[in-house]
Amino acid sequence: MEVQPGGGSDRPELDPEAQGILFVVKGTATLRVNKQIHKLAPGGYAYLPPSSGWTLHNTDKEVLCFHWVRKAYDRVEGIDRPDILITNENDIAPTAMPDTDGKWATTRFVEPDDLRHDMHVNIVTFEAGGVIPFLETHVMEHGLYVLEGKAVYNLNNDWVEVEAGDFMWLRAFCPQACYAGGPGRFRYLLYK
């Protein structure tokens, strides 16, 4: 999403069953939810459960750019709905993957064992030379938006060059691997 200075919406979400995740990549969002105002700078993250009644405006002089991931919430009897969560990636320590010397890490805004959440948006980071050293698959479809850097990504046995601004949508069980050759780090926003 791109919002010009002075733009925004007093009612961006019209579906009362939709949950949303906002992730700011440029500018500053003024988010109002539950009568509280939050300023989301780059790296800012907001989880908004269904019927949150939020507003979002760009009160800054710079263009606001953010990702808005929406999904109908799947209720499960006996499990409470998630709470609103406002944070910034800089406030969360990345978790290094085992046996990677810290060259492959994931920043998790919500822990995967929190069953209240039926979708997740994380940041995956590879330092130069970092790899997914094996073909992996996932049971669910998922999307990747490249935030920074360049890499080659194995998608269903085809090696594809990807860079900042690229988007990939992977079907369930699509074999994948990655090599981030550098010179800088490679990062992507992961939705699943």
Locate the predicted segments by residue.
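A short, N-terminal "cap"/entry segment at the start of jelly-roll beta-barrel domains
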Residues: 5, 11, 61-119
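Glycine- and acidic-residue-biased ligand/ion/polar-headgroup-sensing regions
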Residues: 17-30, 34, 139-156
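Short acidic-glycine-tyrosine-enriched beta hairpin
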Residues: 35-50, 156-172
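Conserved short histidine dyad/triad with adjacent acidic residue
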Residues: 1-16, 107-110, 122-138, 172
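Short, solvent-exposed loop/turn positions at domain surfaces
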Residues: 10-11, 18, 34, 42, ...
